[in-house]
């Protein structure tokens, strides 16, 4: 996990290692097989909603997510203009006139409903939809649940990946986030929750703006990791139906990341992942686990150690799936990302689903966080 933080802080632009393709003579059956593969390939869309969500998809466009269509959605025209995506949607043109939602989830919700037809058209044909946003503001908090409902009703496996605000951002954003999270759980198959406060336990001296970038990077790694286990050729890939089996009606999920380059790197990485501050739940009753293993030279014995360790720590009836991606840039490091589904989270409370009222009715101390 610390290596991930270091990579964000000291990121250097390098061209990815390219392995030359071996030229193989094509036959008529190869062409037919290619067509069949294209027809059965899972269509995965990633939708970034609001300022934080658009920051995340912008980063995804930089690093590349194999086999995914990237869509940016916002009420703020100026912010949307700066984002890189395969498709951009300015929602609520009549309601907000492109000026944003003003940290009001109700405006974000109404903006998405106003643009429902355009959103529906953009999601047409998707087998799986990731919705990513930072909860606590207006657009992401309000619009993401509407988009999740649309995607799920259209038959797509709908997975929301969201961050919760830092405590220092104030009670208003915390209450808004709670409201948005409840609605996302209602309308998504699975909601992966990343509490930003937990980043402070990983790297307490991290500058605030860098902390937001690290949060973005964790969102990116979660979506990219799951997607490419399906779409990108690797040492061990997952079938889309495997992922559906774990994440369909998966409820609340948490993520843990661990890494090690020691002699016992596999076991240490698995232990770090399950003891990650981000994995802030009791996983013993979890209904499912998705394990993403990556490294330059992962051995089968090491993969077995990781899988057995995770399996021992979740419910015996939990469905555990796993895959391995070869990443030369990790060198001697093994990285383990686990997504644990069907957990009971303290971030979901049985209170009434309403965002915090206006500042005049419920005063709170707010800290303005600049856009990154």
UniProtKB/Swiss-Prot annotation:
Function text: Essential cell division protein that forms a contractile ring structure (Z ring) at the future cell division site. The regulation of the ring assembly controls the timing and the location of cell division. One of the functions of the FtsZ ring is to recruit other cell division proteins to the septum to produce a new cell wall between the dividing cells. Binds GTP and shows GTPase activity.
Protein's gene: ftsZ1
Cell location: Cytoplasm
Residues annotated for GTP binding in this entry: 51-55, 138-140, 169, 173, 216
PANTHER family: CELL DIVISION PROTEIN FTSZ-RELATED (PTHR30314), MITOCHONDRIAL DIVISION PROTEIN FSZA (PTHR30314:SF3)
Protein known as: Cell division protein FtsZ 1
Biased composition (Low complexity): 361-372
InterPro entries on file: Cell_div_FtsZ (IPR000158), Cell_div_FtsZ_CS (IPR020805), FtsZ/CetZ (IPR045061), FtsZ_C (IPR024757), Tub_FtsZ_C (IPR008280), Tubulin/FtsZ-like_C (IPR037103), Tubulin/FtsZ_2-layer-sand-dom (IPR018316), Tubulin/FtsZ_GTPase_sf (IPR036525)
Gene3D superfamilies cross-referenced by the UniProt entry: Tubulin/FtsZ, C-terminal domain, Tubulin/FtsZ, GTPase domain
Family under the similarity heading: Belongs to the FtsZ family.
GO molecular function: GTP binding; GTPase activity
Keywords carried by this UniProt record: Cell cycle, Cell division, Cytoplasm, GTP-binding, Nucleotide-binding, Septation
Organism of derivation: Pyrococcus furiosus (strain ATCC 43587 / DSM 3638 / JCM 8422 / Vc1)
